Amino acid sequence: MKTRNRKNGYSANTAKQYVDQKQAIHCLSTEFEAQIKFEDGQPTGEIIGHKAWFSQKGLPPFQVKFESEVTLPSYLAMVDFEGLEACEVGYNVYFRANNIKEIK
């Protein structure tokens, strides 16, 4: 049996199942990690995204991918995501967002 709402690819509903947008989310990264494109198991050197780590009370730290350049807030700053989506692959959940903003 499979869940009814599960679909392939990224979804905002999947992200809402894991991350509570009403609770504080903190930035754990001080700089982005570049995601390199691979072809035939070999890196091409082309950067296709940037990843950073975040934390929320009650959750393990999670990584969010940004496909465009965004400004990373300072360490432990409270943040909010624009367009947060998640994708379930096996037992892993992968997140991506369009933008990030610091909450003052």
PLM region spans:
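OB-fold and OB-like single-stranded nucleic-acid-recognition modules
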Residues: 1-104
